[in-house]
From Swiss-Prot:
Protein name: Uncharacterized zinc-type alcohol dehydrogenase-like protein YdjJ
Gene, per the UniProt record: ydjJ
Required co-factors: Zn(2+)
The species this protein was found in: Escherichia coli (strain K12)
Keyword DNA repair among UniProt keywords: no
Record-listed Zn(2+) 1 binding positions: C39, H65, E152
Record's keyword terms, sorted: Metal-binding, Oxidoreductase, Zinc
Cofactor descriptive note: Binds 2 Zn(2+) ions per subunit.
Organism superkingdom: Bacteria
Enzyme class: oxidoreductase
UniProt record similarity statement: Belongs to the zinc-containing alcohol dehydrogenase family.
Amino acid sequence: MKNSKAILQVPGTMKIISAEIPVPKEDEVLIKVEYVGICGSDVHGFESGPFIPPKDPNQEIGLGHECAGTVVAVGSRVRKFKPGDRVNIEPGVPCGHCRYCLEGKYNICPDVDFMATQPNYRGALTHYLCHPESFTYKLPDNMDTMEGALVEPAAVGMHAAMLADVKPGKKIIILGAGCIGLMTLQACKCLGATEIAVVDVLEKRLAMAEQLGATVVINGAKEDTIARCQQFTEDMGADIVFETAGSAVTVKQAPYLVMRGGKIMIVGTVPGDSAINFLKINREVTIQTVFRYANRYPVTIEAISSGRFDVKSMVTHIYDYRDVQQAFEESVNNKRDIIKGVIKISD
C-alpha cells in the first residue's frame, strides 16, 4: 500500500505529496478513503487560507473533512469494526470531559480537534487516515461511500432542523439554496414539514430545491423576496426562518419574514457585522445560531438509507483525486453551476 495527501501549498495551489500510511492507535481504525466532499469552508481555505491561521507559519495545511471509505486495519481495543467495513466519520473529535461535552454539546467543545482546521489542520484528501472508533460509523448495505461522505453536510441540516423543533404544520422559509440550504430543506421534510419556501438568486439551485420538495421557490434577484414570502405565509410570517446563505443581505431580511414568537436559525457563516432591525423581532422572536452538529449522524444515516433524504442527486460534479487543483479552481470560479462537488480518492 502507498499513501499520498493533497495539501494547500499556498492559497490557490494544491499539491499532492507522498505520505506515510498512519498506524492506528489502540482505539482507532485505519480507513482507505474513497470519497471526499468539497465544503464551502474548503473552498474558502483554498482561496484565502484557513479561517484560523496556524501559529506556526510552516504548518502543513490539509483540506477536506466530509469523507467515507473502507476500514483496512483496526487498533487493539477496537470492537465495533473490522477490515472491510464501509464507514464514514465525524471529523470533529472533542475532548470528552469539558462542561459542553458532558452536556452532550460536544460540537461546541473549545478543544475539539476538527479536520482541516486547528490545532492539527489534518485534511481528508489522502488515501489513508486514522480516526477514533467512537466517531466512526458503519454504513448500511444500501448506502455507498459517496453518500457516506455526504452525511456530514446532511447532518448540519438535520441538526439545524432538530434544534428548530421542526414539526408537521409549521411553515418554513429557507434563505439560500446552496448545499447546506438544500440539506436543511430535506431535513425539514424528514421531520414532517410540508410547507417550505426556498429563496436563492441562482436558477439551478432553485430547480434543485423544487426537485427535492420545496413548496415554493423564489428568485431573490428577480422577485421581491419579502413580498413573496408574505404571500407564502398569508402575511403571518414563517414559524421558522433558516438563514443558510451566510449573507448580510439575507440576515437583514430574516426579521421581516418570521412570525410573532417564531424562530430565526442562523446556519450560514455570516462574515463581519450585520444589521438587524430589532424592532421587527421585538415580538418574542428567538434567534438561534447553529454550529456543526452533535449526536445527529445516526438519524441522518438512517434518513439517507431509508430514501427519505436524497444526497446523491445534489452531486453535480465528481473529480478524480489527481485533479484536485482543478476541483478547487472550478469550485471557486464555477459557483453558478456546482451545487455539490466531490472528489473520488480511490475505488
